[in-house]
From Swiss-Prot:
Function (record text): Catalyzes the reduction of the glycolytic intermediate dihydroxyacetone phosphate (DHAP) to sn-glycerol 3-phosphate (G3P), the key precursor for phospholipid synthesis.
Pathway recorded for this protein: Membrane lipid metabolism; glycerophospholipid metabolism
Keywords on record: Cytoplasm, Lipid biosynthesis, Lipid metabolism, NAD, NADP, Nucleotide-binding, Oxidoreductase, Phospholipid biosynthesis, Phospholipid metabolism
Provenance organism: Phytoplasma australiense
Family indicated by similarity: Belongs to the NAD-dependent glycerol-3-phosphate dehydrogenase family.
Name under which the protein is recorded: Glycerol-3-phosphate dehydrogenase [NAD(P)+]
Organism phylogeny: Bacteria, Bacillati, Mycoplasmatota, Mollicutes, Acholeplasmatales
Keyword Membrane belongs to the record: no
Subcellular location: Cytoplasm
Catalytic reaction annotation: sn-glycerol 3-phosphate + NAD(+) = dihydroxyacetone phosphate + NADH + H(+); sn-glycerol 3-phosphate + NADP(+) = dihydroxyacetone phosphate + NADPH + H(+)
Length: 329
């Protein structure tokens, strides 16, 4: 089948190769001329690795005519603008698969909520997310990876499962808990930032394990707030993606946290990076959410104080350690 990928960065270009491996015809849309040229020359947009039988264009109208299945692989902060253009130019109903992991800071919206707000019902056929522990650096090398396709319409999740699954290296599970999948996938980026800070400060594996455990508690609180399922927290988009993002040197969020821990500011890191670090934006959204609704998310609060208020690490850490005694979980 024909599939259009909206966004030709590391993950978008990698998924294009996955779909081509599965004998689908893929067109990648992006505005980055360098990405387009590399893909059309048979190279990955980011990695120095070949791509086979994939075309790319900067013409959104052509991209929308090419397929009625759109894979959304753009940063969350750009999602609203891209969807507005899609709504304006689409002539037929579309099905969407979101692979972007983040929360919109200005609204606290998950991507599914942005889609439902922007795309008219007459143009919105189906929606799913595709999440889980999946560094593009490994998937493009066809290393075994497991993901979860989540949709409120389980039959559509099953359809996406069949489209993306590859018998050699990619297995897709399904879930009807779309909300939980989206929340977990956004929060794990924030927890990876925090773990990077801990590593840079010389904390050991005991401390990192404690962060993961308490991070899972905060993840469950957020999923509950959004009316998702706790089981999702323990699944691929929750615990699975948290492990890979919080500990891997491939992780942009973990690496950014290390830089924060070494003394760099948020502004310095962003000025030096040419790739999206979703954890920074999601942190703002979750911090504002916990402030507005009085949620008990001490790790979120601490990370925000460190990164955006530039409070000394020692003071923030001491406040965490001096919190009242309580039972676990």
């Amino acid at each position: 089948m024909h599939i259009t990928i909206i966004g030709g960065g590391a993950w978008g270009a990698t998924l294009a190769q996955v779909l081509t491996d599965n004998n689908h015809q893929v067109l990648v849309y992006d505005l980055n001329k360098n990405y387009i040229n590399r893909i059309n020359q048979g190279m990955h947009s980011i990695f120095d690795l070949p791509l086979k039988n994939i075309q790319s264009t900067s013409d959104l109208e052509i991209s929308l005519l090419y397929s009625d299945l759109l894979v959304l692989a753009v940063p969350t902060k750009a999602m609203r603008q891209v969807l507005q253009q899609i709504a304006l130019l689409s002539k037929t109903p579309k099905s969407f698969v979101n692979v972007s992991k983040g929360i919109e800071p200005s609204t606290f919206f998950r991507v599914s909520q942005i889609v439902n707000q922007i795309i008219p019902p007459s143009l919105l056929q189906n929606y799913a997310s595709l999440m889980g522990p999946s560094h593009a650096e490994e998937v493009i090398l066809r290393k075994v990876t497991l993901l979860t396709a989540a949709s409120s319409d389980l039959s559509f999740a099953t359809e996406i499962q069949k489209i993306f699954s590859n018998p050699i290296y990619l297995k897709i599970y399904t879930s009807s808990d779309l909300v939980g999948n989206e929340v977990c996938s956004a929060l794990k980026n924030v927890l990876a930032l925090i773990n990077g800070i801990l590593v840079a400060k010389g904390f050991g594996i005991n401390s990192q394990a404690a962060l993961i455990s308490r991070g899972i508690v905060e993840m469950s609180r957020l999923v509950t707030f959004y009316h998702g399922s706790f089981k999702t927290v323990l699944g691929l988009p929750g615990l699975g993606d948290l492990i890979v993002t919080a500990f891997s040197t491939h992780s942009r969020n973990f690496s950014a946290g290390q830089k924060i821990g070494a003394g760099k500011t948020y502004e310095q890191i962003m000025s030096e990076s040419d790739q999206v670090i979703e954890g920074f934006q999601s942190l703002v959204a979750f911090y504002q959410l916990q402030s507005k609704h009085q949620l008990d998310l001490p790790l979120i609060k601490a990370a925000y104080q460190l990164i955006y208020e530039c409070r000394p690490f020692e003071l923030v850490f001491d406040e965490l350690m001096q919190r009242p005694f309580k039972s676990d979980c």
